[in-house]
């Protein structure tokens, strides 16, 4: 059954005409990303040549997807909007709250028991408001979306930063915070800064151990974690033909690590085949009829430099297997360089655990190719040195892989098969170790490798590679093992080599599944009661944030001046804290606990200016809030890099932090801060960061004249009585300033 088929038929009936009208209006050929963007304007009459990276534009996405950890807050906000049903097709996916411990057979029932209150809430809200519900064990949100919902030319938002995964099937798919999702769910315009366009020209063909994962790992080394901010990466060139749809999804998925708005591939025969193999023949046919407008125009491809803001050239035939890390996904290292780089940087060279899965690499093809490496180890009698853990991407993939013997190939070398869920990728991993502070190395096919992220150990050096390389390094037990050139010993002491991985893109017998774990949207039913117990520590109804009082912010204590990388993991940790994602008061206890204090080099230890004692960040914030005192956070570049979790914006707002002053922001987090009525400001001169001292009282003036393009003034009152003043800037437009004045975007919408 094709889900939401009437919406899809209606969309394709008008798509090509919308694109043609857009070309006539802007009077030039269009890139593929532009075609999709212009076809989804909230008000088509406002179409014009928007300034990329500058102007905000209102869009009308086709659908919304939410994972269970972020859906709670999104749907709590939606419930306050007073709507009878969602305005567009939507789905909830229970994938984040399942912990990987001993294996799927025991872990899934335990998760259902532990998270029953949250699952019941999400299920009842879904049934009440006409939302599709994918229960625990059904699979990882982005793999399920690719298999069931993604379609060429469409636009979707998702409350997860790796929503761009659907770009592998030709969608503009953007990760957002819950408040943005609520805009779409309630039928309001969804606002986005018109993205810059980075064209990625692919030539050649992958071979040997090189994979689509290595393409994006190489691009991360080129562009870095900030290089894609406020941009769409659009892929083109003859190299596209040799990459499968799931491989393209992998590349789009990790565009999030570049800070990109999203990434997109054009519709082609691989996409058509994927749609047909996943039971969506009619969509493939509809897309084929619109194929000319599901790709960049010929004039663009003939002279890409005239249409893209930046061009990146990648020769696939020269791409090597990469191992990116540790601690940041843009530390790109070809595996052939690791023998020199590892010892030079004092990396722990023994690979203790290899983890295959995540929304990035858990497709049938991923598992089949990784299993071909595992099968060689078994057949050649190679002793596996590390522990191997597998998370399939969906129940359909797990069932099919089990039928085809793929899971058996992993089990024969001692692999542990976990639930169809995120698990270790987001810190939902009960790692069995005798010392959770010991320096060690793990290799994963995941997307992020921030310190502490996987297992909570700050001394775990996590490296990212392809599933195939992850399995090979786990077998070898060495970080510097190059499977293309190095050998291993078999049980008889003979040197043997691993052959390059092989594996079918699609199962030869077709996909199969007994129970997808899906409850289709029912008619909206106002009689369904959504129960939230008053004494619950997992769920809490939201109270509106207070509006701006019309005054400047004077003598705010510095809550923390963070040093170095400060991701959403540092601001609002996942792992054991995921259970509080529906309870703002409780989860606020983890505020900035991973951030490094610039004044002492420690995490979660800041000075409370009221008594001079050093306490946890949330403790200091609560002390200020109890006295009615607003506070401020000062940070470095790319503040809020990482996930879409709006808790990283709601927690400081809840604890009366009014301002985040940073050198620069990650896109999603900056929007989330604005949505929650906070001030996200940047230094005009980044060196002014160095003027901020630990005991400063900080004032922000000029708010009565707060306007697009205006500057505000920060004054630092130092402990010795001296002062420093400097200007700060912002990217707020008129609507976003109205959010600030109303107290939040939701407050503003409620007043309209």
Where are these regions (language model features)?
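Mobile "lid/hinge" segments at catalytic clefts and subdomain interfaces of large enzymes
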Residues: 3-4, 68, 151-284, 382, ...
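Terminal amphipathic helices with adjacent charged low-complexity linkers/tails
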Residues: 42, 46, 51-60, 74, ...
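Extended C-terminal subregions enriched in glycine
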Residues: 379-429, 435, 643, 649, ...
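Non-catalytic terminal/interface segments that mediate subunit docking, oligomerization
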Residues: 76-80, 306-401, 405, 523-659
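Short glycine/threonine-rich loop-to-helix capping motif typified by GTGT followed
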Residues: 47, 147, 151, 243-249, ...
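Long, structured ligand/cofactor-binding scaffold of large enzymes
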Residues: 8-11, 15, 20-195, 581-633, ...
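Acidic, glycine-rich flexible loop/linker segments
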Residues: 488-505, 670-739, 746-749
